[in-house]
Swiss-Prot record:
Red blood cells. It comes from Mustela putorius furo. Residues 1-141 form the Globin domain. The modification Phosphoserine is found at S3, S35, S49, S102, S124, S138. The modification Phosphothreonine is found at T8, T108, T134, T137. Pfam families: Globin (PF00042). The keyword ATP-binding does not apply. The modification Phosphotyrosine is found at Y24. This is Hemoglobin subunit alpha-1/2.
Amino acid sequence: VLSPADKTNVKSTWDKIGGHAGEYGGEALERTFASFPTTKTYFPHFDLSHGSAQVKAHGKKVADALTNAVAHVDDLPGALSALSDLHAYKLRVDPVNFKLLSHCLLVTLACHHPAEFTPAVHASLDKFFSAVSTVLTSKYR
């Protein structure tokens, strides 16, 4: 459960990311594919090479979904219901992949914003990404 302090940390960090969210989403997705090659199996139709326009575009979709989740942090199930359906019923993404991408998002954000990435912010973002992952996998049960 996200505390009020966690929500503040997540919102303020996301505000600082600003217009870079799509860029960071693409970078985190590319990092996920490089670090965890099994995640590539869901994208056989993508050019997965470094700097791929398809990876960047999908990373932007991920970032846009997270931006929506930040804006609706008090109702993540409502905000992410359609994405949960998509990933559970149509794409059938293995739930572990959300944890892997979350880790790579944390690494990417820490690389770009080291001064702001305090232990408290790290913990809050980790809890937020975990909450998002939980919602996205809730329809699997």
